[in-house]
């Protein structure tokens, strides 16, 4: 987008150090052109690869490369390692549903035992858990460390029968679940000089074995200055599993025992522990680099100089001082920024600062805005910028004397000096063409093709808009909204409506030339709702009848967006299009699409094509929309393939939202759709936005993920940004960081309010820096890490084979944990898996990401659904991605009707269900109520008002309003869960042992997937094996 006339010189014109001075980076997966595997990163027959099924690798030199990803991220080609045994062949859905075995136990029998074997897992013994706190190391574990930890140990197991010697030939394992069902096996492994078996990656360069006395290879250089104190971590031990394990000298074989899932780290326990220690308290942001409560913990946040974690969460709150440390640890340095996050009513709203025509005070060199990180000197006449260290003169209007500690006397009176987040009123320098913007407009665009008329959708939309238009957002002090509204209907042609307030009847104008769309009227198209209410209601009453006899099935789509954008452009205002659409646009027009849903591409290198838009029309249309501040929100009602990858591109790139209701049925889906529409119309939103992330010297923002457009390396452009959208930003070093000054981040968003005022919203955050790797690991936040990994992987889906992306994710998980083990943990047996306390649930969350249908196809999931989920995750904040990948599972049968507390959640595994139980599962998109066959009759009566399990109607999507405590309590709990989520969750009732349970079971993410995807236990074993291989 051309910036001319968009933002004048003061705000964003001058470069700052470290911004825009290098070519763009491509995150952790690289752009399509970078596909060579960096040395030491990919191990085609690594620990999860085609090694001997029961064999062991001889100790040898370490992997050759220093780290897994180069400066521009990891790039890999060829076959990634095979990982887990694949599922049995699937003939049809019904037969793959394991029958329930009659059981005397109350526990819920699963189709796959939790001790289901892999080549490693089959030899695991039972684990016992031994916890030791920060002051106690386990016996023979070396010095105590500062971190609390959990140690999981296993008794010895039988020695492995064979050791892989040079030249040994072993058969590859069966096709793996990580590479998708049916993946072809890899070639036979062969001996390599670095001690790893398997074929070398293309272009790999080998290093000779180390000379006598030489240390481990560059992959894990020994730490001296930055080794830090020893830290205890969660430890799982698998004696004898790996080279160096004590079981090589073990006695007679011991009987195999089941691996106990209770002995591995539990996400539920981590969530509950944090709630117990920090829930309901005040969290003050006055300390640099402090780790906030988890997103799952409710607390009151008090801004005392750093932005609330509602606005910014980081993957780690302590950055490594050098890029070498960052490469060694492999922990992504990133922030998830949600600039318009909703602030609870018990917390202070953002203060608005108005400096009149002078505008915000900014650093002359780097253009950072005045904030708590600026240091005033020389009696208050000058200040030193915290970001670039430039010394600036204080403008005369802004001068104030300093107190005895060098702080301004008005420190606590000025939000920009004492708070982490605040807003400025922007001057004309920050406006397009240096003139104030007009208030935004909402345009409602309704597909009136045959199917939408016949199923009653058009009538429903028109009816509901009458009441919803009353709720169009307005400024708190205003009586009416400044937002204007307009209406268009379409099928193969476009119908514009004149609803000027002085008309007796609305007037329709038809545009048939969809190749060159124009706006046939200006005056009367965009109107104030209050003034034209009667004409608008008249129109909404007429539309369903107007098209009642239409037999037109073909629709256009791109011209609809074009028409809305041209209307906003003609009115010289930003705005939002609400498009209600239901079919593949097959009519002759720009953006015409064909059905390209090809299942043959699944599990091939061409699978990425399914996620790419079919034509470049939508990409250029999105750029035009952003250039004119036009955001697009799309409500899709498909009954078959509609190519979400193409249709959803404009909503994604313009800061809009995509909602999808498959096979829409009025009686089942009406409420979900209306809830979504109402929330979308009413939500807090900013228009025509540009975001810039500034950093202190030593590091810079290099990559951005979200519903955004970038025409250069620094400015994040968004036609609109609302309270649910987050942008994830990755940082890289460009120099050393100082422990004293830390790492400072300032996010500035320039936007237009719903009343047409131009503002700047500023968020500031200070992080610590350390030369000790231990500090970096102590300060990590797993929920933010998973948000980053998901977005970087889902972005890479457009350019790289999915199996390569899955491989990179497993590789990086192992690298992070191996670096911790080598440099931070107390000495321990090689057979123990040691996890940092802050990352002990990283493996389970990473496995959930790997099993998501975007990265691992499943036969029952459509191509459109995969494209839809990919798009949703790209704009999610940390709380939404946490719930999406690890759903909440609540035992409803344990409800205490006298308490307002939610029942304690249980782990997402079939083993946690019981025949006597009723469970509620929610992941932010779906909600299920699962009913065991022996559910208590009094609960069934209380919730459904029917006498028994057999009488329950599973078609209902809303619970009946039964006037008893159980029903009221359950509906209250569902309301609480729903209230915090951006999408309305339709309820599905699932009975144990009935067919719909197949869908429900896919959300039990700790279990093995029906069509691929490892169980949590198996994944943990495989990560451990890979860590051991890295360390050896």
Curated annotation (Swiss-Prot):
Segments for region (Disordered): 1-260
Chief subcellular location: membrane
Classification via SUPFAM superfamilies: beta-sandwich domain of Sec23/24 (SSF81995), C-terminal, gelsolin-like domain of Sec23/24 (SSF82754), Helical domain of Sec23/24 (SSF81811), vWA-like (SSF53300)
One biological process term in Gene Ontology: COPII-coated vesicle cargo loading
Compositionally biased intervals (Pro residues): 198-212
Subcellular location per the Swiss-Prot or TrEMBL entry: Cytoplasmic vesicle, COPII-coated vesicle membrane; Endoplasmic reticulum membrane; Cytoplasm, Cytosol
Per-repeat ranges for Gelsolin-like: 901-974
Family annotation (InterPro entries): ADF-H/Gelsolin-like_dom_sf (IPR029006), Gelsolin-like_dom (IPR007123), Gelsolin-like_dom_sf (IPR036180), Sec23/24_helical_dom (IPR006900), Sec23/24_helical_dom_sf (IPR036175), Sec23/24_trunk_dom (IPR006896), Sec23_24_beta_S (IPR012990), SEC23_SEC24_subfamily (IPR050550)
Listed Gene3D superfamilies: beta-sandwich domain of Sec23/24 (2.60.40.1670), Sec23/Sec24 helical domain (1.20.120.730), Severin (3.40.20.10), von Willebrand factor, type A domain (3.40.50.410), Zn-finger domain of Sec23/24 (2.30.30.380)
Keywords (A to Z) from UniProt: Craniosynostosis, Cytoplasm, Cytoplasmic vesicle, Disease variant, Endoplasmic reticulum, ER-Golgi transport, Membrane, Metal-binding, Osteogenesis imperfecta, Phosphoprotein, Protein transport, Transport, Zinc
Compositionally skewed regions (Polar residues) per UniProt: 102-133
Coiled coil regions in record: none
Pfam families linked to this entry: Gelsolin, Sec23_BS, Sec23_helical, Sec23_trunk, zf-Sec23_Sec24
Tissues where the protein occurs: Ubiquitously expressed, with higher amounts in placenta, pancreas, heart and liver.
Noted disease: Cole-Carpenter syndrome 2: A form of Cole-Carpenter syndrome, a disorder characterized by features of osteogenesis imperfecta such as bone deformities and severe bone fragility with frequent fractures, in association with craniosynostosis, ocular proptosis, hydrocephalus, growth failure and distinctive facial features. Craniofacial findings include marked frontal bossing, midface hypoplasia, and micrognathia. Despite the craniosynostosis and hydrocephalus, intellectual development is normal. CLCRP2 inheritance is autosomal recessive.
Protein name: Protein transport protein Sec24D
């Amino acid at each position: 987008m051309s910036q001319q006339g968009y933002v004048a010189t003061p705000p964003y014109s001058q470069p700052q150090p470290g911004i825009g001075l290098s070519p763009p980076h491509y995150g952790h997966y690289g752009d399509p052109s970078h596909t060579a595997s960096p040395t030491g990163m990919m191990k085609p027959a690594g620990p999860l690869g085609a090694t001997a099924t029961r064999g062991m690798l001889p100790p040898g030199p370490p992997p050759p490369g220093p780290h897994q990803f180069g400066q521009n991220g990891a790039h890999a080609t060829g076959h990634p390692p095979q990982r887990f045994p694949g599922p049995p062949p699937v003939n049809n859905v019904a037969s793959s549903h394991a029958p329930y075995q009659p059981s005397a136990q109350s526990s819920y029998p699963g189709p796959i035992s939790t001790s289901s074997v892999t080549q490693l897992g089959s030899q695991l013994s039972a684990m016992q858990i031994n916890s030791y706190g920060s002051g106690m190391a386990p016996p023979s574990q070396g010095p105590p460390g500062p971190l609390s930890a959990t140690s999981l140990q296993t008794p010895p197991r039988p020695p492995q029968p064979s050791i892989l010697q040079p030249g040994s030939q072993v058969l590859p394992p069966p096709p793996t679940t990580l590479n998708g069902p049916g993946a072809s096996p890899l070639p036979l492994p062969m001996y390599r000089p670095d001690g790893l078996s398997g074929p070398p990656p293309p272009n790999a360069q080998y290093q000779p074995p180390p000379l006598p006395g030489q240390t481990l290879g560059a992959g894990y250089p020994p730490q001296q200055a930055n080794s830090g104190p020893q830290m205890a971590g969660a430890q799982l031990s698998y004696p004898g599993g790996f080279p160096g394990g004590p079981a090589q000298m073990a006695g007679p074989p011991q009987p195999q025992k089941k691996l106990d899932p209770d002995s591995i780290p539990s996400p539920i326990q981590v969530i509950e522990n944090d709630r117990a220690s920090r829930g309901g308290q005040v969290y003050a942001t006055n300390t640099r680099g402090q780790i906030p409560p988890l997103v799952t913990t409710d607390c009151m946040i008090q801004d005392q100089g750093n932005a609330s974690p509602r606005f910014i969460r980081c993957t780690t709150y302590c950055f490594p001082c050098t890029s070498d440390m960052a490469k060694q640890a492999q922990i992504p340095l990133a922030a998830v920024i949600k600039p318009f996050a909703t602030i609870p009513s018990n917390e202070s709203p953002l203060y608005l600062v108005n400096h009149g025509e002078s505008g915000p005070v900014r650093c002359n060199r780097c253009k950072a805005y005045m904030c708590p990180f600026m240091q005033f000197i020389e009696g208050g006449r000058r200040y030193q910028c915290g970001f670039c260290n430039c010394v600036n003169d204080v403008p005369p209007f802004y001068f104030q004397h300093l107190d005895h500690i060098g702080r301004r006397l008005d420190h606590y009176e000025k939000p920009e000096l004492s708070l982490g987040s605040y807003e400025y009123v922007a001057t004309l320098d920050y406006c397009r063409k240096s003139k104030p913007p007009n208030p935004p407009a909402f345009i409602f665009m309704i597909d009136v093709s045959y199917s939408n008329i016949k199923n009653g959708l058009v009538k429903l939309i028109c009816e509901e808009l009458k009441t919803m238009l009353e709720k169009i957002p307005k400024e708190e002090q205003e009586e009416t909204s400044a937002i204007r509204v307009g209406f268009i209907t379409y099928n193969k042609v476009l119908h514009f409506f004149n609803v000027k307030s002085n008309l007796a009847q609305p007037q329709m104008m038809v545009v048939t030339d969809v190749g060159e769309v124009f706006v046939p009227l200006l005056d009367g198209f965009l109107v104030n709702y209050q003034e034209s209410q009667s004409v608008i209601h008249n129109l909404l009453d007429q539309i369903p009848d107007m098209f009642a006899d239409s037999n037109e099935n073909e629709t256009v789509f791109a011209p609809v967006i074009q028409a809305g954008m041209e209307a906003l452009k003609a009115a010289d205002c930003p705005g939002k299009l609400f498009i209600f659409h239901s079919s593949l646009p097959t009519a002759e027009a720009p953006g015409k699409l064909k059905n390209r849903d090809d299942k043959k591409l699944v599990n091939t290198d061409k699978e990425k094509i399914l996620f790419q838009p079919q034509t470049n029309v939508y990409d250029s249309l999105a750029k035009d929309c952003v250039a004119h501040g036009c955001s697009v929100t799309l409500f899709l009602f498909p009954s078959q393939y509609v190519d979400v990858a193409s249709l959803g591109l404009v909503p994604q790139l313009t800061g809009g939202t995509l909602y999808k209701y498959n096979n829409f049925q009025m009686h089942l889906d009406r409420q979900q759709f209306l809830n979504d529409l109402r929330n979308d119309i009413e939500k807090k939103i900013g228009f025509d936005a540009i975001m810039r992330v500034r950093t202190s010297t030593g590091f810079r923002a290099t990559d951005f993920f979200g519903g955004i457009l970038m025409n250069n390396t620094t400015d994040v452009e968004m036609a609109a940004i609302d309270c649910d959208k987050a942008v994830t930003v990755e940082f890289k070093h460009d120099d050393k960081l100082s422990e004293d000054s830390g790492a400072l981040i300032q996010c500035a968003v320039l936007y237009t309010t719903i009343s047409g005022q131009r503002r700047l919203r500023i968020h500031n955050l200070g992080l610590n820096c350390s030369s000790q790797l231990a500090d970096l690991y102590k300060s990590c936040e797993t929920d933010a890490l998973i948000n980053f990994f998901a977005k970087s992987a889902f972005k890479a889906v457009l350019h790289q084979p999915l199996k390569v992306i899955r491989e990179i994710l497993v590789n990086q998980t192992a690298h992070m944990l191996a670096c911790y083990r080598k440099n931070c943990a107390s000495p321990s047996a090689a057979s123990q898996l040691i996890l940092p306390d802050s990352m002990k649930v990283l493996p389970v969350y990473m496995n959930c990401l790997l099993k998501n249908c975007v990265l691992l196809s499943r036969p029952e999931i459509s191509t459109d659904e995969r494209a839809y989920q990919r798009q949703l995750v790209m704009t999610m904040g940390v709380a939404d991605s946490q719930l999406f990948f690890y759903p909440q599972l609540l035992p409803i049968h344990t409800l205490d009707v006298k308490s307002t507390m939610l029942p304690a959640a249980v782990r997402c595994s079939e083993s946690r269900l019981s025949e006597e139980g009723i469970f509620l599962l929610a992941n932010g998109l779906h909600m299920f109520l699962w009913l065991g066959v022996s559910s208590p009759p009094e609960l069934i009566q209380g919730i459904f008002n029917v006498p028994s399990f057999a009488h329950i109607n599973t078609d209902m999507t809303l619970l009946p309003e039964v006037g008893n405590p159980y029903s009221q309590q359950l509906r209250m709990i569902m309301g609480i869960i729903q209230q915090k989520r951006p999408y309305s969750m339709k309820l599905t009732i699932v009975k144990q042992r009935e067919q719909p349970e197949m869908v429900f079971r896919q959300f039990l993410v700790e279990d093995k997937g029906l069509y691929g995807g490892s169980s949590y236990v198996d994944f943990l074993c495989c990560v451990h094996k890979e860590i051991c291989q890295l360390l050896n």
